[in-house]
Amino acid sequence: MVLEMLNPIHYNITSIVPEAMPAATMPVLLLTGLFLLVWNYEGTSSIPGPGYCMGIGPLISHGRFLWMGIGSACNYYNRVYGEFMRVWISGEETLIISKSSSMFHIMKHNHYSSRFGSKLGLQCIGMHEKGIIFNNNPELWKTTRPFFMKALSGPGLVRMVTVCAESLKTHLDRLEEVTNESGYVDVLTLLRRVMLDTSNTLFLRIPLDESAIVVKIQGYFDAWQALLIKPDIFFKISWLYKKYEKSVKDLKDAIEVLIAEKRRRISTEEKLEECMDFATELILAEKRGDLTRENVNQCILEMLIAAPDTMSVSLFFMLFLIAKHPNVEEAIIKEIQTVIGERDIKIDDIQKLKVMENFIYESMRYQPVVDLVMRKALEDDVIDGYPVKKGTNIILNIGRMHRLEFFPKPNEFTLENFAKNVPYRYFQPFGFGPRGCAGKYIAMVMMKAILVTLLRRFHVKTLQGQCVESIQKIHDLSLHPDETKNMLEMIFTPRNSDRCLEH
């Protein structure tokens, strides 16, 4: 009898359920179960961030990056969730970090020497496993990096001072080419042409059409920025990316014509040692079978676009800051007079220009251009107590870190922020470690040579009190002015060398 009562078959289960649980309760239990499932998933990560929410969270976070731009989205998420947080890009877990201790750990270790980005996007712009900037294959990247390091140091760095200064002088003598009818100077175009001319003189040495290639470089950069984290489905709809594909092709075709001429000259050169430069070294490596032709072409392209792409914008922001801060301009001019006088700048002067160096550092801290770094974890790790799995994407929000830690007046532009030595873990405009910027030393040389040459000849002024704070900017892969807006030009007033401190 007892066994019969315990036997579930003895009962009609369908008649029992309605008595024990009303039909309306079933949806509630299902929703509760789903909630517990989601809660259990989210509980597997101790890192702050938005909820997974049945896959909706990753879609929203990736969508925010596409809508706001990478830089703006990073700042948003760090403000909301803290300085070490987690989102998703293309369904992959991605950390956004603005803590100096975490950045220091990541930059110094080899297992963070890879970047991340859409494979299809990088293939479209020619950077997938080629070149150096976004080459995500560590072994291939290690093959190309030494060519860049050699070209950007030693004799090349020494020559850069004279080459850069002479190029700017030549372009200033033709200032009317970038001056409109009102007498306003298109500073960005001027600086981009100087940067391209300087890079070509040192690394390729083939005559080129500066104005045409500068325009093509901007088109290439727009494509790079637009395609870097696009979802794969974007590339299945040809009309969506067709214009970017064309922009990339326009620049690559132009550069390949120059490289073809370089190859021809190398083949007819009797004394090869007299034509050795960055491009020649790469072409000879190709002949030895060390590099593919496609990789050689991409390396040369990246060397030519690097300075016009970022350094020109950095110098543009610096000139706007000088225009707003006459006391800083006066201090820089005094130092130029003391260290250099009326002669041309030389390599020995570079280290002596301390006021200018602090100005450059403070400009890059206060108004950065490249303010984030994208990396990928190549093995499991623990960072500041948080577990990081192999394959995790990481974005280092350097620009935000520069306004959060160490500096006495982080939200002001003032040289007081560099009055004392700043430990390098708190200031990383170029990064450091295995994947630090290969051109960080030559970049400082170029910026000092440009500023000395320009400021000793002209006093600069913005239009209608325009300043870096009021310029409308696009904050995506980098932070740069929105060039569709007006009043980005400047007024250049010739400076009387005998009265250069009157302004």
UniProtKB/Swiss-Prot annotation:
Widely expressed, including in adult and fetal brain, placenta, skin fibroblasts, adipose tissue and gonads. Substrate binds at residues 309, 374. It is found in: Endoplasmic reticulum membrane; Microsome membrane. Phosphorylated in vitro by PKA and PKG/PRKG1. These phosphorylations inhibit the catalytic activity as measured by estrone synthesis from androstenedione (36% decrease for PKA and 30% for PKG/PRKG1). Its main location: endoplasmic reticulum. Pfam families: p450. Keywords: Disease variant, Endoplasmic reticulum, Heme, Iron, Lipid metabolism, Membrane, Metal-binding, Microsome, Monooxygenase, Oxidoreductase, Pseudohermaphroditism, Transmembrane, Transmembrane helix. GO terms for molecular function: aromatase activity; electron transfer activity; estrogen 2-hydroxylase activity; heme binding; iron ion binding; oxidoreductase activity, acting on paired donors, with incorporation or reduction of molecular oxygen, reduced flavin or flavoprotein as one donor, and incorporation of one atom of oxygen; oxygen binding; steroid hydroxylase activity. Changing residue 435 to C: In AROD; 1.1% of wild-type activity. The keyword Membrane applies. Changing residue 365 to Q: In AROD; 0.4% of wild-type activity. Its EC number is 1.14.14.14. Heme binds at residue 437. It is a multi-pass membrane protein. Its cofactor is heme. It catalyses: testosterone + 3 reduced [NADPH--hemoprotein reductase] + 3 O2 = 17beta-estradiol + formate + 3 oxidized [NADPH--hemoprotein reductase] + 4 H2O + 4 H(+); androst-4-ene-3,17-dione + 3 reduced [NADPH--hemoprotein reductase] + 3 O2 = estrone + formate + 3 oxidized [NADPH--hemoprotein reductase] + 4 H2O + 4 H(+); androst-4-ene-3,17-dione + reduced [NADPH--hemoprotein reductase] + O2 = 19-hydroxyandrost-4-ene-3,17-dione + oxidized [NADPH--hemoprotein reductase] + H2O + H(+); 19-hydroxyandrost-4-ene-3,17-dione + reduced [NADPH--hemoprotein reductase] + O2 = 19-oxo-androst-4-ene-3,17-dione + oxidized [NADPH--hemoprotein reductase] + 2 H2O + H(+). Changing residue 264 to H: 2.5 fold decrease in affinity for androstenedione substrate; slightly affects PKA-mediated reduction in catalytic activity as measured by estrone synthesis from androstenedione in vitro (28% decrease compared with 36% for the wild-type protein) and PKG/PRKG1-mediated reduction in catalytic activity in vitro (15% decrease compared with 30% for the wild-type protein). It is an enzyme of class 1 (oxidoreductase). Pathway: Steroid hormone biosynthesis. One of its GO terms (cellular component) is endoplasmic reticulum. Changing residue 192 to H: In AROD; strongly reduced aromatase activity; 81% reduction of androstenedione metabolism compared to wild-type. One of its GO terms (biological process) is negative regulation of chronic inflammatory response. A cytochrome P450 monooxygenase that catalyzes the conversion of C19 androgens, androst-4-ene-3,17-dione (androstenedione) and testosterone to the C18 estrogens, estrone and estradiol, respectively. Catalyzes three successive oxidations of C19 androgens: two conventional oxidations at C19 yielding 19-hydroxy and 19-oxo/19-aldehyde derivatives, followed by a third oxidative aromatization step that involves C1-beta hydrogen abstraction combined with cleavage of the C10-C19 bond to yield a phenolic A ring and formic acid. It is linked to Aromatase excess syndrome: An autosomal dominant disorder characterized by increased extraglandular aromatization of steroids that presents with heterosexual precocity in males and isosexual precocity in females. Belongs to the cytochrome P450 family. This is Aromatase. The gene is CYP19A1.
